Swiss-Prot record:
This is tRNA (guanine-N(7)-)-methyltransferase. It comes from the Eukaryota. GO terms for cellular component: nucleus; tRNA (m7G46) methyltransferase complex. The lineage of its organism: Eukaryota, Fungi, Dikarya, Ascomycota, Saccharomycotina. It is found in: Nucleus. It comes from Debaryomyces hansenii (strain ATCC 36239 / CBS 767 / BCRC 21394 / JCM 1990 / NBRC 0083 / IGC 2968). The active site is at D189. NCBIfam families: tRNA (guanosine(46)-N7)-methyltransferase TrmB. The keyword Transmembrane helix does not apply. Its EC number is 2.1.1.33. Signal peptide: none annotated. PANTHER family: 3-DEOXY-D-MANNO-OCTULOSONIC-ACID TRANSFERASE/TRNA GUANINE-N 7 - -METHYLTRANSFERASE, TRNA (GUANINE-N(7)-)-METHYLTRANSFERASE. Forms a complex with TRM82. SUPFAM superfamilies: S-adenosyl-L-methionine-dependent methyltransferases. Belongs to the class I-like SAM-binding methyltransferase superfamily. TrmB family.
Amino acid sequence: MGKIEATSKEEKLRVQKEAEARRRAYRDLKKEARQMQKEVKFDTDDNSELPKKRFYRQRAHSNPFSDHRLEYPRSPDTMDWSKFYPQYYDSESKKMTSEVEIADIGCGYGGLLINLAPEFPDKLLLGMEIRVQVTQYVEDRIIALRNQYRNELQNNYQNISVLRGNAMKFLPNFFHKAQLSKMFFCFPDPHFKQRKHKARIITNTLLAEYAYVLKEGGIIYTITDVEDLHNWMVKHLEEHPMFERLSKEWEKQDKCVSIMWNSTEEGKKVTRNKGSKWVACFKRLPTPDDCE
């Protein structure tokens, strides 16, 4: 009996190792292709297949306070956006022709980015994600879509990109004051334990930074399937002097609310499980004269 159990455990371990080896080989292949795509324009005849999510396994959440050895610019002026949006880079002036205007904080597998891209063809959208494998998946997904739609004049996904970053620590390193018009916080980590609430993506301290990078009239979009987290985010945003909640009527008419309702992987899962979703949107108010 003992030998049978030992053999079963060894077989299970062997299968797990083989599966991990296949995932690693797949990711290495995509990484090599990703590096090649960054060096060339998308004018070849090959068809890039969309990446397979099962090869990019990752924990559901990541500790934002950990040292993730992230690369980030010293200031927005030193950030090189050309490799993220090559079609928006003017090689003669060596400057970008447009700035990032819409940010998806904790973009997950990129569903919202990809659905928003055709709605804002003249604006640059950026997804920020802290998890390594998930970021690589979104990057591979965008590269594949750019290849598939390279002959389209519009809706060719050149206006979206993703970077691995920690928005809770380094957001002002990437964006100038009043640069963004929209920020999305879709199904963030709820951090249920009270001692973990400081790690939530909406806090008084972080709202000051969001107010800094948002332009006057800019919108913060939030959606979650956790009512307690929804109440937490609403409470902190309503208490902050630089934000004002938008009405339910406004939410019903806004196309971004409709898109984010069911475009993310988490949102689709909640729908499949017939769960509830809570939405709240807030407008960035003008800065008082005595604060400028």
